[in-house]
From Swiss-Prot:
Protein name: Chitin synthase 3
Family: Belongs to the chitin synthase family. Class IV subfamily.
Main location: membrane
Name of the encoding gene: CHS3
Transmembrane segments: 169-189, 201-221, 451-471, 1017-1037, 1040-1060, 1066-1086
GO molecular function, one term: chitin synthase activity
One record GO biological process: ascospore wall assembly
Membrane topology, record value: Multi-pass membrane protein
Purpose: Polymerizes chitin, a structural polymer of the cell wall and septum, by transferring the sugar moiety of UDP-GlcNAc to the non-reducing end of the growing chitin polymer.
Record key words, sorted: Cell membrane, Cell wall biogenesis/degradation, Glycoprotein, Glycosyltransferase, Membrane, Transferase, Transmembrane, Transmembrane helix
Species this chain originates from: Candida albicans (Yeast)
EC main group: transferase
Matching InterPro entries: Chitin_synth, CHS4-like_dom, Nucleotide-diphossugar_trans
Keyword Glycosyltransferase set for record: yes
Length: 1213
């Protein structure tokens, strides 16, 4: 396909965020040619390429900047999706360089024939997928169901076993002692449960391995590599119980000396009369005739016994003080050679003495000016002892005197000074006769242990300090610039105090809900004037209130310069000058005035057809509006089904917060919540200050569930909060869809209720009630499970997939289930918008209250930076001081946001966007040519998140317990170069568990899902940074830290106890602990707006054994528990998981058609009904014409938006 870039195309503001949207040449981001990459199911762009290839006959796909086109591939796979029925083509590497033109703002490709242009077969323009052609031979049959080259009853082709073979063998090997019968006896009847238990034991063993390694590294490594069993004693500190001989200390306290001259038999030489204790006796056991042989020679008149060059001794055999203060004395006490121990018996007795320690000198000792000491090869030599040599009897080399007399050598290491062989032999000789000890040095092992210790210390401190610094930077600099408004320091601190006041007391200036103009209120009805006139199309619609915008179309670049950022609405405005709506013979046809095909159809009107694209005071813009005969081609949904009281759409240039508004779906998933919890959530979303024209509430009830303590089922509670339903409540039908489950539960049914949110005047005053469109989807289950305890229940992930799969079908114009078509039609009924208009999804749990301006700041961040694919706000605790269980959670919540998420947000890689309050981008603008990149609606996200094959412990923990965190991880894996950030300006509050058993159950799910998601993320190689300075390495450290939490807190307590009861005090360990636990406390003092958090910090410290030992240990032992436990309880329900397989999936019950086929079928049915009715009424001629728009702007009096001043004078009904 051709590239739609044009040299004259305007460059809008969002391009600055996307450096790849320029015209520069060169390969981007990767040294590997993506077109040569391996294309299999493990590739992050695999499913996207499948869909792009399958739907390439009616959508345009922009190749990446590397030239890769997913539609042109030689490698195709036979694998198929479990939610769709497309074939498997290849994919391309860089998703940022590819896109789908949800709006082509330039001319059609020159390579596309004119016929294709007329039918829009070759491309996809504006917001729709216009693949309808006159020849229906290639269209799917009306009753076509899911088809495939293989039976759909098979859940999914089995994966090769070789990748998990080793793990299975290991699990069976380590649990060999627990045979299957024994496990069955202990309540594990099925093979799946038994193998899950074996996997649990295998994972626990791995955790023990990691903990043992950390323990060894902390306590055992030094002892292993630096295991010096000999005690080392510093010189001048050798006490009287030891005798020093040749630099070694001997314990002679229990020795007995044989009878000798002056010595009685059995006496101890350490005591009187010898008094040798603590002295140096090296001259009493001289090393002679070794290295000194040939150097120290006898004189001719030598009185020392000798044999050739061998001498009996060199110095007089006397004791001298260890401090070297003894002067030379060449006399003998009793006779010549007395005490020299030259006999074989004396020598053997000496050699058998046990060495109790080495005597060592520090460098300060060596440099002692009172002694003449030098170091040679680690040995300390006392050169003054040369003076003891009996020079009258022997001769020695002149080098001895030179070394002794040269002051420059004193206190130095002379190992490198003595270089030639003669000098080295002389040095070895001196080592044998005048060595007094060893220099204070460590062995290689000891040095290595210290290096490891200090490197670990530096690394841990670096991580902690860098996180602290980054968190402070984020708080003081980055966060103030986020969102719709930039605050200075004082205003930012004031806002934080307002949020805290709102959390604690549910009031505050910033939390006040604004008054709503009368005509925008929930109780205002169009029927108050003339409801039927809304549908009357007797007169042509004109430019009306937006006439001032016509100036932009005289200057092609004027409008594009108006919009700094890109949204679907701004691109709709740009259509006016690019001739959208040229179809067949109507392309150059003037309906209300003459204009050619290049002119906008801004003024184009038609009976039951398009109106002014910008002049839409009612939000009834249908990008598929018919411009031909509907009996031949279905180009759009019928405008006659639009609700008369839809919320008006403001002009496209309306920017109340300084950025173009983006349409947002507010998804609220419900399970067993009570009325109060659901009402609080829906009230807070409905009353946010974000314009109600751009927000839609979508509530999905996960089954017919009655929460514990509730009088009604959850669906009934929600439906009681709706009014003005498009279809009466008791007439709504159930529609089929493919659920995220296995076996017969893959077929599920749901009902779609469309209307508007119904406030309670006691919770929200009438003057503050915005009119909000609302859709409720109730998963009611198939008729076969009507009597089951929880009919329709498939889990929260299935609820999310209902929306995500629907958005994918809309973006790619794929075949839809009947439920998805009903969703498309319901959105059209209550908003007048096609679903493609929506760009953002806010996900909120049904027990969360949102701060009034949170949605505004979150959408602002999305619109201003198209590279952001997901973000989250701050979750506050509303019941802080309810019990000790809630109190210990306050600081944990705070630090997880303002340290962990703040640090990750600096690098755009927040690893967990909490499902209770987060926002995802459905699609992102790409370049200036109208292309959009599917994000949340990306097939790779939808297919992998909807995976129903959960046959391993790892996948069950990912998909059944931690689906919210898994979605965040999946987004980072699929789009590693895009951002997930934290926006503290957006705040919400929720009620946390107040009972320990509930907290235990909740954290069991969170911890286990965290471990498995971190393991997934640590394998992502494309995250920012390199080696140790990368998010991947930080995630690896976080994974190890999570696994060893129980061991770490045990080591911490041990170190503290050792520091108290023993010596020496482990100073470094205590400093490390102080930094690790102290910096978070400093973070509170520096950044928090309420000092009460310091109290909760102290409480958190006392609760550390619970957080770091009790909770993770319990979670690890419950690795094979996939239930939600005590977190969500239902009346009469169980706590089972959604992984059970029951029955077989019958695909024939689920029809899959494109939305046009569904619409054609609906219109045909209605036409038949009308014909039958006309026959019954004798063809009455007073029927109303089919309406084409939901609102006549001539009724507004020229005003699109009511002024607040009207609120005082206008009434409401």
């Amino acid at each position: 396909m051709s590239n739609f870039r044009d040299s004259s195309s305007p460059r809008r503001g969002y391009s600055e965020f996307d450096p790849e949207s320029g015209e520069g040449l060169g390969r981007k981001k990767s040294l590997i040619r993506p077109e040569r990459s391996r294309m299999d199911e493990s590739h992050p762009r695999f499913h996207y390429t499948q869909v792009a290839n399958q739907e390439s006959n009616h959508i345009k796909v922009q190749p990446s900047s590397t030239g890769v086109d997913p539609r042109k591939s030689n490698e195709l796979s036979t694998s198929r999706s479990h939610l769709s029925n497309y074939a498997t083509p290849p994919h391309q590497e860089e998703e940022e360089d590819e896109g789908i033109p949800l709006m082509d703002i330039h001319n059609a490709s020159p390579n596309v024939s004119s016929d294709q242009n007329n039918d829009l077969k070759g491309g996809r323009e504006v917001y729709g997928l216009n693949d309808e052609i006159n020849d229906y031979g290639s269209s799917p049959k009306k009753n076509q169901v899911i088809s495939s080259s293989r039976p759909m009853n098979n859940e999914k082709p089995a994966k090769p076993k070789h990748d998990i073979y080793f793990w299975k063998v290991y699990c069976y090997a380590i649990t060999f002692w627990a045979p299957a019968p024994l496990l069955k006896l202990f309540g594990l009847p099925t093979k799946d449960r038994q193998f899950a238990w074996r996997e649990k034991i295998g994972l626990i063993s791995c955790i023990l391995y990691v903990g043992a390694f950390v323990a060894y590294l902390t306590f055992g490594f030094t002892k292993t590599v630096c295991s010096s069993q000999v005690v080392r004693t510093q010189i001048n500190h050798v006490n009287g119980g030891y005798l020093i001989i040749n630099g070694r200390a001997y314990d002679l306290t229990s020795s007995q000396h044989p009878k000798a001259a002056g010595i009685q038999a059995g006496s101890n030489v350490l005591y009187p009369p010898m008094n040798a204790g603590g002295k140096d006796a090296s001259f009493l056991f001289q090393n002679v005739n070794g290295n000194c042989k040939g150097l120290i020679k006898p004189r001719d008149n030598c009185s020392i016994p000798y044999d050739g060059d061998e001498l009996a001794w060199y110095m007089p055999c006397r004791l001298f003080n260890q401090d070297g203060s003894t002067k030379p004395n060449n006399t003998f006490a009793y006779y010549k050679g007395w005490a020299c121990h030259t006999s074989e018996t004396a020598r053997d007795a000496y050699y058998k003495l046990k060495v109790n320690g080495d005597v060592y000198f520090t460098w300060d000792d060596v440099k002692n000016s009172s002694r003449n000491l030098v170091v040679y090869s680690g040995n300390v030599l006392d050169l003054d002892l040369i003076n003891w040599i009996e020079t009258d009897d022997v001769t020695y080399p002149e080098l001895f005197d030179k070394l002794r007399d040269d002051e420059t050598y004193r206190g130095l290491d002379i190992s490198l000074v003595l270089t030639n062989s003669e000098e080295r032999q002389a040095a070895r000789c001196l080592t044998e006769i005048i060595k007094v000890g060893s220099i204070d040095t460590d062995t290689i092992g000891c040095i290595a242990s210290k290096v490891v210790l200090y490197m670990s210390l530096v690394f841990i401190l670096s991580v902690v300090v860098v996180k602290f610094i980054m968190a402070c930077w984020f708080k003081w600099v980055t966060s103030r610039k986020q969102g719709a408004t930039m605050y200075d320091s004082k205003a930012w601190a004031k806002r934080n105090r307002e949020i805290e006041d709102w959390v604690d007391h549910d009031h505050g200036i910033g939390a006040e809900v604004k008054t709503v103009p009368v005509k925008a209120r929930a109780n205002y009805k169009a029927a108050k004037t003339n409801r039927q006139s809304v549908f009357h199309r007797a007169q042509k619609l004109s430019l009306g209130p937006n006439a001032d915008l016509s100036q932009y179309y005289d200057n092609p670049n004027a409008l594009s310069k108006t919009f700094k950022y890109t949204t679907m609405s701004t691109q709709a405005a740009l259509l006016g000058r690019n001739g959208y709506g040229k179809r067949g013979n109507n392309a150059n046809k003037s309906v209300s005035g003459g204009f050619n095909g290049r002119q906008s159809n801004l003024y184009l009107t038609d009976q039951g057809s398009s109106t002014d694209l910008l002049n839409r005071p009612v939000s009834s813009y249908n990008p598929f509006d018919s411009m031909g005969d509907d009996s031949i081609v279905i180009n759009g949904l019928s405008p006659d089904i639009i609700h008369p009281d839809v919320v008006p759409q403001p002009p496209v240039e309306y920017q109340p917060f300084g950025y173009p508004l983006a349409h947002t779906i507010n998804l609220v998933t419900c399970y067993s919540e009570d009325e109060e919890g659901i009402r609080i959530t829906l009230d807070s979303i409905a009353t946010t200050d974000y314009p109600n024209s751009h927000k839609l509430i979508l509530v999905i009830c996960d089954g017919i569930i009655k929460g514990s303590g509730n009088d009604e089922t959850t669906p009934d509670i929600v439906l009681d909060m709706m009014s003005d339903l498009t279809v009466p409540r008791d007439e709504v039908e159930a529609y089929s869809y493919v659920a995220v489950a296995q076996g017969s539960k893959r077929h599920n049914m749901a009902k779609v209720y469309a209307g508007f949110y119904k406030y309670n005047d006691e919770t929200v005053p009438p003057e503050k009630q915005q009119r909000i469109p609302m859709i409720t989807i109730v998963k009611c289950g198939t008729p076969e499970e009507a009597s089951a305890p929880k009919p329709g229940n498939r889990g929260k992930r299935d609820s999310q997939i209902i929306l995500m799969s629907f958005l994918q079908k809309v973006v790619f114009d794929e075949r839809m289930t009947s439920l998805e078509y009903e969703m498309l039609q319901s959105i059209w009924r209550i908003t007048g918008l096609m679903a493609e208009f929506y760009e953002i999804v806010l996900m909120v749990d049904a027990d969360t209250k949102v701060f009034p301006d949170s949605l505004t700041h979150m959408v602002a961040e999305m619109v201003k930076d198209p590279t952001i694919m997901g973000l989250c706000g701050e979750t506050k605790i509303s019941n802080k001081a309810q019990t000790w269980v809630t109190a210990i959670q306050v600081f944990e919540y705070y630090i997880s946001h303002h340290q962990a998420k703040a640090f990750e947000s600096i690098f755009g890689g927040v690893t967990c966007l909490p499902g209770c309050f987060c926002m995802y981008r459905i699609k992102a603008p790409k370049g200036s040519d109208g292309y959009w990149v599917p994000i949340l609606a990306n097939p790779d996200i939808v297919e992998r998140y909807s995976d129903n094959v959960v046959d391993t412990l790892h996948r069950k923990n990912l998909l059944l317990l931690g689906e919210d965190r898994y979605l965040s991880s999946l987004m980072l894996r699929t789009f590693p170069t895009r951002k997930q950030v934290f926006v503290p300006k957006a705040a919400c509050k929720t009620v946390v568990p107040d009972k320990f058993k509930v907290l235990l159950s909740q954290r069991r799910r969170w911890i286990n899902s965290t471990v498995h998601n971190l393991f997934e993320l640590v394998l992502v190689k494309d995250l920012c940074g390199t080696f140790c300075f990368s998010m991947q390495f930080v995630i690896f450290i976080e994974l190890i830290g999570t696994l060893v939490l129980p061991a770490a807190i045990t080591f911490t307590i041990y170190v503290i106890i050792v520091a108290i009861v023993s010596k020496p005090t482990p100073v470094m360990s205590l400093v490390l602990l102080a930094v690790i636990f102290g910096l978070p406390g400093c973070l509170i003092v520096i950044t928090v707006s309420s000092l009460s958090y310091l109290v909760y910090f102290v409480i958190y410290l006392f609760a550390l054994p619970i957080w770091n030992f009790v909770l993770p240990s319990y979670a690890y032992w419950k690795f094979d528990d996939f239930s939600w436990g005590e977190t969500r309880t239902v009346a009469g329900g169980d706590k089972g998981d959604h992984s059970a397989v029951e029955g077989k999936f019958d695909s024939s019950k689920i029809a899959m058609k494109r939305w046009r086929e569904w619409e054609r079928e609906r219109r045909s049915t209605e036409n038949r009904k009308q014909q039958q009715q006309q026959q019954l009424t004798n063809n009455s001629s007073n029927n109303l014409a089919v309406p084409g728009a939901a609102w006549d702007p001539s009724n507004t009096g020229g005003n699109l938006i009511d002024d607040l001043s009207q609120g005082s004078s206008s009434g409401s009904s």
